[in-house]
A protein has these predicted regions:
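Conformational-control "hinges and anchors"
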Residues: 68
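Short, mixed charged/polar active-site loops
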Residues: 37, 71-73
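Generic signature of intrinsically disordered, low-complexity segments enriched in small/polar residues
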Residues: 18, 43-45, 75, 114, ...
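Charge-rich, low-complexity linker and terminal segments
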Residues: 1-12, 73, 82-154
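A short coil-to-beta-strand element that immediately follows conserved catalytic motifs
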Residues: 54, 73-79
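A positional/architectural concept
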Residues: 1-62
Length: 154
């Protein structure tokens, strides 16, 4: 998104719109699917040779759950977007694209979970335990899994 500094009114200007999710550079990411455009609402003002941009950005995405690997939809939002850009003499435009991209990517959870109650996958057979129990036999401590081998190292 490019703001033309020369067209900003003395009282500031409002910008509403959508940006292509292509600016994120995440095409083909196996853990995330884009479900809509990046939406924004900004207010831009020139204050003491600086362009100050405040507002909100957001987008809908489907993320892979870190426990069960199923996809779930969520909205990523920053309700307090704030940036200041120096505007030297002769500069007519300021590009916000990289800052919008950075903000959206930093808002994504590194270990997204579909629900706090998600049971995940069986470590032996890989069945999604949210869909029901698997037929694996529990190990000595009552849980299915191969981690019991590590307990023997003590």
């Amino acid at each position: 998104m490019i703001i033309e500094v020369t067209k900003i009114s003395p009282d500031g200007s409002e910008y509403d719109g959508e940006e292509s999710p292509g600016i994120l550079g995440i095409e083909g990411d196996p853990y995330m699917r884009v479900e809509g455009p990046i939406t924004y609402h900004f207010r831009a003002e020139v204050v003491s040779k600086e362009l100050v941009v405040t507002g909100q950005i957001g987008m809908k995405v489907a993320l892979a759950c870190g426990r069960c690997a199923g996809f779930f939809s969520t909205t990523v939002q920053d309700l307090s977007f704030l940036r200041a850009y120096p505007v030297p003499e002769g500069v007519e435009t300021v590009d916000l694209t990289e800052d919008i991209r950075e903000d959206i990517l930093l808002l994504l959870e590194p270990f997204a979970v579909c629900s706090p109650a998600c049971k995940g996958l069986c470590p032996k057979c890989g069945k999604n335990l949210n869909e029901g129990a698997c037929s694996c036999k529990p190990d000595e401590e009552g849980k299915a899994g191969d981690w019991s081998e590590l307990d023997r190292l003590r």
